[in-house]
């Protein structure tokens, strides 16, 4: 997706909220938008 490794790391190294799909920091424990605690790591590989 990114053109170089630094961009790839910046785009994919996040957590996604399971309720509102917001992007959060990797170290986040709760969602920045809705406060939900169930966060998942962003998928590194696209589903085909």
From Swiss-Prot:
Cellular component, GO, one term: ribonucleoprotein complex
GO biological process, one term: translation
Key word Ribosomal protein present: yes
Keywords noted in UniProt: Ribonucleoprotein, Ribosomal protein
Keyword Ribosomal protein: yes
GO molecular function: structural constituent of ribosome
UniProt xrefs under NCBIfam families: PRK04136.1
Family: Belongs to the eukaryotic ribosomal protein eL40 family.
Name of the protein: Large ribosomal subunit protein eL40
